[in-house]
């Protein structure tokens, strides 16, 4: 399989690493659990979120999945969009003792996304792209990826780059795809680093530069992206001669 077919295949997979943490800098992390609980019971949405996280992780208190789910729900109901996002993922998987419910998960994501929560926007984009609980709608996927990418969420920038590279839900635009991969790589997204290496190798959206291709493959490999290590080995074995573009045909679906 040639470099960009690998790139596109891998980059189109759902959940390319965990979405960027989106917790508010509200000082709650420095408080003891007892104080967080006091604030949560007094109605503070962010404190409810902090309590839920502590109960889920078992940090600073004994882990209690059922109570964690309760407080995520409480935080979500009081307008904490990070809580809506996390609760959506839990409900989608049926985690923490919650009943799996795709419809409820989508409603929670939609609520958070419509209020500008970038990870929710990105995840909705993935669900539209893959027909996960809804009909496939590539244009909607692009729209949601763009909203999240505009907020500099690296995983969304990478996902949008793949859509632009492949012409999915939008016109194919190698220049814009390169820009998205570049921005996502600056945001430390490992898959984007791999994809940027591929763009430099092929000369897509930029001047061909095998040294930069190797540089970004190495950066991605250092982040644990296995395919990037293979790309480095392949480049060395090809004596710096990339595969012809005509052989690069990526699948239409992840």
PLM regions with names:
Residues 9, 16, 21-56, 254:
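N-terminal leader/linker segments that initiate helical-solenoid repeat arrays
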Residues 27-31, 207-254:
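Terminal, low-structured helical/coil segments at or just beyond the last alpha-helical repeat
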Residues 37-39, 74-75, 111-112, 147-148, ...:
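Canonical positions in the second alpha-helix
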Residues 49-50, 85-86, 119-123, 138, ...:
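Alpha-solenoid helical repeat scaffolds
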Residues 50-57, 86-94, 123-130, 159-166, ...:
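Hydrophobic face of amphipathic alpha-helices that form TPR/SEL1-like repeat modules
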Residues 86-89, 110, 123-126, 130, ...:
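Alpha-helical adaptor scaffolds
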